[in-house]
């Protein structure tokens, strides 16, 4: 069964659950079946440790709503981290425990990076040689297998990565074939792939591979979808202001489908025909005022792509 969902931006919550009831009620009223929430927006993990009182506070709110729940791990989580590696492992474990306690079936995780975003502007662009890259990926795979193996009730969904100038490729996950290989290396039935349409659009344009072929490569291990739009123009890591980026069409804009130039029929059309997971319309907070209009467009898009084709 396909479940349509949207996200509550972590910056909107910023550690407070006060807005959750109203946001959840609004999402349910729009006819959506799910919601995705950044765990980091709930202020439930501090220096790797899970605050179970925050979990209970969340559950008390969540129990009032009949929505499918997915969580997004902190963007800063890096299972290849060379600095504070043990803390990153604690964060990953705490995220999975939060999911298990709250009843969330899916945790979206950004795969390990050669250069983490937290080091942009400090570290130089760097990509390991093939041997070092393989060893790092094997270590990450063992880490995920060990920690995720303790939470078989939670699906870990590794997300294909966005691109940044001048650091890309800053992670193997910019390349669909390498992300697929990593999931197969992990070899757990509850570890799969989150296809992010915006990230794929950026990576395909920057690296020169076929967008639809990249999506098709990931399809066999696909467990989760992030659907949003952009113009496929990679920006510099320092370009953070959406008000300035949108006029130039640069970066990971997380716009409603139809505002950019992604060919959704070619990229996700074939996937949606048989997909039975959660498809999240993952938008930036700046689109919240017109959320109803944007979700209607998202619902029409998905319905049209899943409609039977003429014989």
Residue ranges of model-derived segments:
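Residues at or immediately flanking beta-strands
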Residues: 34, 68, 155-157, 190-194, ...
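Active-site acidic/histidine proton-transfer and metal-coordination neighborhood
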Residues: 64, 81-192
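Hydrophobic residues within beta-strands of alpha/beta enzymes
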Residues: 35-37, 107, 156, 225, ...
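N-terminal pre-domain/capping segments
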Residues: 1-101, 192, 299-311
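Alpha-helix N-cap and loop-to-helix initiation/capping positions
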Residues: 15, 19-22, 46-54, 83-94, ...
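Active-site beta-loop-alpha junctions enriched in small/polar residues
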Residues: 7-11, 38-42, 74-76, 112-114, ...
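Histidine-acidic metal/acid-base catalytic patches
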Residues: 1-2, 17, 25-28, 97, ...
């Amino acid at each position: 069964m396909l479940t349509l969902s949207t996200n509550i931006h972590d910056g909107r919550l910023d550690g407070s659950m006060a807005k959750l009831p109203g946001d959840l009620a609004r999402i349910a009223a729009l006819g959506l079946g799910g919601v995705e929430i950044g765990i980091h927006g709930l202020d439930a993990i501090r220096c790797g440790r899970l605050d179970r009182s925050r979990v209970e506070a969340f559950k008390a709110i969540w129990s009032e709503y009949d929505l499918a729940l997915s969580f997004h791990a902190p963007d800063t989580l890096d299972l290849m981290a060379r600095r504070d590696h043990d803390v990153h492992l604690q964060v990953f474990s705490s995220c999975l425990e939060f999911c298990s306690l709250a009843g969330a079936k899916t945790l979206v995780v950004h795969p390990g990076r050669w250069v983490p975003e937290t080091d942009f502007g400090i570290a130089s662009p760097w990509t390991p040689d093939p041997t070092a890259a393989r060893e790092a990926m094997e270590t990450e795979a063992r880490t995920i297998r060990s920690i995720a193996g303790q939470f078989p009730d939670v699906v870990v969904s590794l997300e294909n990565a966005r691109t940044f100038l001048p650091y890309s490729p800053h992670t193997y996950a910019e390349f669909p074939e390498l992300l697929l290989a990593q999931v197969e290396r992990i070899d757990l039935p509850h570890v799969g792939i989150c296809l992010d349409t915006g990230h794929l659009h950026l990576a395909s344009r920057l690296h020169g591979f076929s967008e639809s072929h990249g999506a098709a490569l990931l399809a066999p291990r696909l467990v989760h979808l992030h659907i949003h739009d952009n113009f496929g123009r990679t920006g510099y890591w320092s370009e953070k202001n959406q008000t300035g980026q949108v006029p130039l069409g640069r970066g990971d804009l997380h716009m409603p489908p139809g505002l950019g130039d992604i060919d959704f029929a070619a990229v996700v059309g074939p996937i949606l025909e048989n997909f039975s997971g959660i498809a999240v319309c993952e938008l930036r907070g700046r689109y919240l005022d017109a959320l109803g209009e944007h979700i209607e467009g998202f619902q029409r898009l998905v319905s049209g792509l899943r409609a039977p084709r003429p014989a």
